[in-house]
Regions:
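N-terminal Rossmann NAD(P)H-binding glycine-rich loop of SDR-like oxidoreductase domains
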Residues: 1-17
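NAD(P)H-binding glycine-rich loop region in Rossmannoid oxidoreductase-like domains
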Residues: 30-79, 92-96
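Mid/C-terminal beta-alpha module of Rossmann-like enzyme folds, strongest
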Residues: 178-248
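A short glycine-rich, His/Asp/Glu-containing loop-to-beta-strand
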Residues: 242-281
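Short acidic-glycine-tyrosine-enriched beta hairpin
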Residues: 305-327
Length: 365
């Protein structure tokens, strides 16, 4: 891997290790020409990720992008090594600026190498790669926004409506390693999915991650772009910010703590109860809940508010049993053990003080 200590290189190196590849040679700026020669001569697969995108002098584009790629191809050809080569290029290769020209000429050099030697070659024109270990003010706006917002530093946005296309580093890495077991036809290949958004939407989403600690309302962070952005944002948190506190409401019955809220999938909480304490004694019309006793022994009582039908059950911590509250049934939960009881609670909606859908009524009048 050339550029092994860069953003993509680090992620790729870790993934290769996870897959059991133990003979990975990393080439960095600290490596000598002899190191590069030896690594390429014996390589079974080459990931050429090294390049220059923010040089001190514009001439470094040609040297670090075109020149280095030509060197890689020459060493491989002279060694008679027809190992497959992946080139990390850029969508800017389609542009006629110094950087774009240098990347396009690097592509041409690799494609010519493949044609001349028969070696499989793969060119990835990547766009705004983001993810953990990216560098702020260098790799992408995502890295800069995540770094600054995680630290309370202002970000600058000139045009919130400006479009931006993104690709997640994990998806890039999976495309790369996929070639090790399932080769594709030589030429231009893609890594995806690619996500289309705007600079303003990107900033708002990341700001929302930071604000969620106070509001406890988390975005839909389980799929797609938001999932990848959330993981990237968290990777920029300094260690002293890995933990945060939420409000704990305490009274003679025990504690109640709201932990996590979602826009449309309810909220998670937990509560404690001292021995003999009864909570609840109310019913709902639409609101529903799931209870799981984590510690202690609970007695649940239910009464249908119209027919008067009664039901009761007992559950203990460690049983992994969920008890649901049913609309139209008043219910309570009593700690019938000798120690503190701890109960996890999910409700299907965020508590609304204006419309609580909670009406007091004892199970046993």
């Amino acid at each position: 891997i050339t550029g092994a200590d860069g953003f993509i290189g680090r992620n790729l190196s870790v993934r290769l290790g996870e897959l059991g590849y133990t003979d990975v040679v990393g080439i960095t700026l600290e490596s000598s020409p002899a190191d590069l020669q030896a690594a390429l001569s014996g390589a079974g697969f080459v990931f050429h990720l090294a390049g220059v995108n923010r040089p001190k002098d514009i001439s470094e584009f040609a040297e670090g992008n075109t020149g280095l790629t030509e060197t890689v191809c020459r060493i491989l050809a002279e060694a008679g090594n027809k190992a497959p080569v992946v080139l990390s290029s850029s969508t800017q290769a389609a542009l006629d600026n110094p950087y774009g020209v240098s990347k396009r000429e690097a592509e041409d050099a690799l494609l010519a190498h493949g044609k001349a030697t028969g070696a499989p070659v793969y060119v990835y024109r990547l766009t705004n790669v983001f993810g953990k270990w990216s560098r702020p003010n260098y790799n992408s706006a995502v890295a800069t926004f995540c770094n600054n917002i995680a630290r309370g530093i202002d970000i600058t946005i000139n045009d919130p409506a400006a479009p931006v296309k993104l690709v997640y580093v994990d998806d890039v890495v999976e495309a790369f390693v996929g070639l090790l077991t399932k080769p594709e036809a030589s030429g231009f290949v893609t890594a995806g999915p690619e996500y289309d958004t705007t600079v303003g939407q990107l900033a708002d989403t990341i700001r929302g991650f930071a604000a969620s600690r106070a509001s406890m309302i988390t975005d839909r962070v389980g799929t797609g772009l938001v999932r990848a952005l959330y993981s990237t944002y968290l990777s920029f948190l300094p260690p002293e910010a890995f933990a945060y506190s939420v409000v704990k409401h305490s009274d003679p019955r025990g504690d109640f703590v709201e932990m996590l809220k979602t826009p449309d999938c309810g909220q998670f909480s937990y509560f404690t109860s001292h021995p003999g304490v009864t909570r609840g004694e109310h019913y709902h019309h639409t609101k529903t809940e799931k209870f799981m006793v984590l510690k202690g022994t609970a007695h649940f009582g239910f009464r249908q508010i119209v027919t008067g039908e009664l039901h009761e059950l007992v559950t203990k911590g460690g049983e992994g049993r969920i008890v649901e509250t049913v609309p139209g049934w008043t219910h309570n939960i009593t700690n019938i053990g000798d120690d503190e009881m701890i109960v996890m609670l999910w409700a299907n909606e965020i508590f609304d003080r204006e419309k609580p859908d909670t009406f007091a009524m004892k199970v046993k009048p």
